Amino acid sequence: MNENEQATRTSGTTERSLPEEVEVAIVGAGPTGLTLAGMLSGYGIRTAVLDGAQGPALHSRAAVVHARTLETLEPLGVVGKMLGGGVVVPHFGVRDRDRLLLRVDFDGLPTTHPYTLMLPQDRTERILLGALHEQGGRVLWEHEAVGIRQDAGGVDLLVRGARGDGRVRARY
């Protein structure tokens, strides 16, 4: 890992201690977990996002962001940054050498985003992580959820962390 990758990787490491209790515990700091945490934090709901990784992903596992996903992300205020860092694709084609087998045009979709956006997932996650930080939320990196106990009042999430085991109590 070079210096830039290390600096980028550790920039996501913002909090190491487990909170005792939160409203919502979220397992995984991928696009879905970060989106949920960002939206809940925007409503003042305290979350704990737990992820066993050392920090944000360094490499992409996906690259396409669909129109409905962009609509969903609008309340977080991240779509402009995503568009600025990606490539808008107004149509999609499948070819067999020189022969076009299928063409899908997105401009007829009933959406404010009649296209797909090509943006590597690691960049998407960094943008979502930035939005979460702006809302006051954090990710607990190097904290892996290893068990759950549920009762009428919520859940106890059993966590294995870099500094030992612990638990987080959450209503949801």
Predicted regions and their residues:
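Active-site-adjacent segment of FAD-dependent monooxygenases/related oxidoreductases
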Residues: 58-135, 149
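Glycine-rich FAD pyrophosphate-binding loop
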Residues: 39-62
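Core beta-strand elements of the Rossmann-like FAD/NAD(P) dinucleotide-binding domain
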Residues: 20-22, 164-172
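Beta1/beta-strand and adjacent pyrophosphate-binding region of the FAD-binding site
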Residues: 15-32
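Glycine-rich Rossmann-fold phosphate-binding loop(s) that bind the pyrophosphate
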Residues: 29-31, 52, 121
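A conserved short coil-to-beta-strand element within the FAD-binding core of flavoproteins
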Residues: 141-156
